[in-house]
Amino acid sequence: EILFYPTAIGWHPEEKAEFGHQQQDAWRTIQRSHSIANGVYVAGVNRVGHEIMIDGTPGIEFWGRTFLSDPFGVIVAEAPDESEQIVYGEVDPSRVEEVRRHWPFLRDRRIDEYGDITKRFID
């Protein structure tokens, strides 16, 4: 099973030097955590390029870096840079079953406790 997670995330040019590495690392970490929590492959797909604002000022720079992580969060394929890429990675369906059996987040979830999840505040 593969979860395709399309994103359009990047940074403003003024933030790149100070926050760029942290932001990109956080994006990769959360995508990989989706793999682990759900026991599936995740294709973290991200837009590339630079968007100029209507007034001509610099807009968001999308960093690309699309990747595929296995059900344990290991990156098995990734785009090498911020250019447009087609990423190919090998998917082993038996790995999904193996990880779910030995790392059973889905099996052990407490769905009976989900009732309040749609509430903004829990009293």
What function would you assign to each model-found segment?
Residues 24-28, 92, 118:
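A structural signal for well-ordered alpha-helical scaffolds and beta->alpha junctions
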Residues 1-86:
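CN hydrolase (nitrilase-like) catalytic-core segments centered on the catalytic cysteine
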Residues 49, 91, 114-117:
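Residue-level signal for alpha-helical context at structural boundaries
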Residues 83-100:
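A short, polar/charged loop-to-alpha-helix boundary motif
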Residues 19, 57, 88, 108-110, ...:
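A generic membrane alpha-helix/interface feature
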Residues 96-123:
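Cysteine/selenocysteine-centered motifs that mediate thiol-based redox chemistry or coordinate metal-sulfur cofactors
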